[in-house]
């Protein structure tokens, strides 16, 4: 039974070394030193082994210390990273092999082996079972601390992870411990191998195995620790060990299959891991804050750009609306200007029509003036012929007063006038616009002619003496005064046979009272009385109009002769022409009126009337000056008022000059 006991001892030593190697966790609960505990718990009397065998379990012995593997070697076997121990500040003490913390292997194979060899357990197994019993209470504390440490973000080393150590360390520890066990087995081969174990040790060993193999301790301890340790990769890979392992060992529990090697951070303490995580989180927070600031700055910039774009858009909209309003106003103004242009065109067209009518009227008047000039030339030639006819001697004064030559002349003039009016009518037919104006003008002339004919009827109703007073007659040669004629020249008058018959009848009635009136004034001058009919006929011939379109009608006039004092109220509807002639003596002693000088007379027969006519227009000017020019620097008179004042002062001399003879 020597070899069998040796193999069992080797197995126990290997199991103990495996427990010692698996007891390396970052959070270690240190127990009292191993030699003291051995002396207290296991006395030498109870140990069935020899001192040499018991020295094998003492790590302080020279042989054991020489043959045991250091903690660094376990660390290098467990992780495959020999430099990891220098990183971690928590280190196992040099007597780590004496640590009472031990774990039962989580395999059914080890449990069956323990069952088979339970009757042959020596003192070393009793000590290991006691150590296991004491480590039973220590299993909870590392588990709780591992659970607390596993709450960190980076993941720490938990108790189940240390419990699930690699098989390479077991193989190496068992292979390295074979030497002393071989020597001790050889020394202790004489010991009785069939020493019975106490029932107390059997109960303790069975309880410890049950507790460690129960699913409450093993499997749930792996379950919660695996997600926390998965971050740091605390599971050790099976390929990191330099020693070949038996694959059948891990078939039942499924440890470390395809797990990545751990990160170096898992060898830090939890405080350092927390510091690292805090540092990482701070850097991430700084980066996120920096990104947040960048995004906020971008948002602010985009908001400002959006505000600028809004302002620009609003400004553009305002400009567009203003442009539209300006366009509407411009269109309205264009329409108004078009309307104004249309109205101006229409008004100018009307004015052009009026101006054309004015030009037509001017052309008609020019043609009429030309016809008047031609008729005047013809009448002048006819009057010369009539003067030659008046030179024959007359038998009686009644016969001398015959008006046949002047009537013949007038008839000739009327015939010429009819021709001219016919030509004028033909011209008026050519111009249709001037018909209305011509008819209005003719109506005015006819009214004026009817008034003049009324004056002639008044002349006819007066007695013969008054009629003779109306005629300009030379009563004596001693006064040396000049007879003044006054006649009214009308405008273009279309004569009719009734008017000519009226004039002939008036002149025939004037022939009867002539002899009686001639004899009464002065009987001492028969020559002048005899020559009076000739002078009267000459006067009548002189009153024949040169223009066939005009008629010269007699009107009363004041004469400077002393015996003729009658005041005449003439009809002043038409323009007056004053004719003055110089005295010419003929061969027969008759003094007719010549046609030399023409004097215009603007004064009436009364001095007061002329004074009022000159001075009355000055009164409104003076009143206006006194009412508006008070305290002003402008003069209170104008040139018109000044001239009228001068005329008032020299009115007497001005009235006399009209009756002077101008040769």
UniProtKB/Swiss-Prot annotation:
Q: Which residues carry this modification: Phosphoserine?
A: 50, 107, 396, 555
Identify the stretch(es) annotated as Disordered: 1-202, 216-267
> Which residue ranges traverse the bilayer?
606-626
Q: Compositionally biased, Polar residues: which spans?
A: 81-97
As recorded in Swiss-Prot or TrEMBL, the protein's gene is named: SYBU
What are the annotated GO cellular component locations? axon cytoplasm; cytoplasmic microtubule; cytoplasmic vesicle; Golgi membrane; intracellular membrane-bounded organelle; mitochondrion
Q: What Gene Ontology terms for biological process does this UniProt record contain?
A: anterograde neuronal dense core vesicle transport; axonal transport of mitochondrion; positive regulation of insulin secretion involved in cellular response to glucose stimulus; regulation of synaptic activity; synapse maturation
* Record-given protein name: Syntabulin
Stretches of Low complexity bias are at: 57-73, 145-158, 188-198, 221-241
Q: Quaternary arrangement and interactors, per the entry?
A: Interacts with STX1A and KIF5B.
Region (Sufficient for interaction with KIF5B) residue spans:
2-417
PANTHER family documented for this protein: MICROTUBULE-ASSOCIATED PROTEIN/SYNTAPHILIN, SYNTABULIN
Functional description taken from the UniProt entry: Part of a kinesin motor-adapter complex that is critical for the anterograde axonal transport of active zone components and contributes to activity-dependent presynaptic assembly during neuronal development.
Q: Which UniProt keywords apply?
A: Coiled coil, Cytoplasm, Cytoplasmic vesicle, Cytoskeleton, Golgi apparatus, Membrane, Phosphoprotein, Transmembrane, Transmembrane helix
Q: In which tissues is it expressed?
A: Isoform 3, isoform 4 and isoform 5 are expressed in HeLa cell line (at protein level). Isoform 3 is expressed in fetal and adult brain. Isoform 4 is expressed in numerous fetal tissues (brain, kidney, liver, lung, and thymus) and in adult brain, kidney, liver, lung, pancreas, colon, prostate, small intestine, testis and thymus. Isoform 5 is expressed in fetal brain, brain and small intestine.
Q: Which Pfam families match?
A: Syntaphilin
Where do the segments described as Sufficient for interaction with STX1A lie?
A: 310-417
Coiled-coil spans in chain: 271-353
> Would the keyword Membrane be found if you checked this record's keyword annotation?
yes
